[in-house]
Regions:
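Conserved phosphate-chemistry cores used by DNA topoisomerases
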Residues: 1-176
């Protein structure tokens, strides 16, 4: 069977994966699949990656913010501290940054499965709030090249890839 793009109904294929490394691997596999077997969909700009948040920051009064990376979370905390200081709040430097920012809780999402249906809708699916990244041909080509290198028949490519990156491995981020 061959793929016929004229049968594409909604003109958007949205890939939803977790915000962690495992989710990135799955997205790479799916982009490679579309690039290899349904290239017209990629070339036509129909593939999107949904970007779920990694953190939920909560403060009193039902105030909440979503952060999509560790860096964004840290920046939000710093901005909240600065805002509180400029509004005259007394900040105890001995308190945790979370408390200094006036936050009650910081929740890290380990995956989409940890969100209830309302959270998933509000953060990742609701058109007004969601963050979508359109996959470009270059993205799919890069994913295909990495996939071929890591999963292909040529052991020497995989070995070289691992050897050049092993020294940069962050063992704290390994999911073991």
């Amino acid at each position: 069977d061959t793929f016929d793009i004229s049968g594409l109904r909604y003109h958007r294929i949205i890939i939803m994966t977790d915000a962690d490394v495992d989710g990135s691997h799955i997205a790479t596999l799916l982009m490679t699949f579309f690039f290899r077997h349904m290239k017209e969909v990629v070339e036509g700009g129909h593939i999107y990656l949904a970007k779920p948040p990694l953190y939920l920051l909560k403060a009193t009064g039902n105030k909440k913010w979503y952060a999509y990376s560790d860096e964004e979370k840290d920046n939000m905390i710093s901005e909240l501290i600065e805002k509180r200081q400029s509004n005259g709040a007394k900040i105890n430097p001995n308190d945790s940054p979370m408390k200094q920012a006036g936050l009650n809780d910081i929740q890290r999402y380990k995956g989409l499965g940890e969100m209830d249906a309302d959270q998933l809708w509000e953060t990742t699916m609701k058109p007004e709030n969601r963050v979508l990244i359109q996959v470009k041909v270059e993205d799919a080509e890069r994913a295909d090249a990495i996939f071929s290198k890591l999963m292909g028949d040529e052991v020497s490519l995989r070995k070289s890839f691992i050897q050049t990156r092993a020294k940069d491995a962050n063992f704290d981020e390994l999911d073991v």
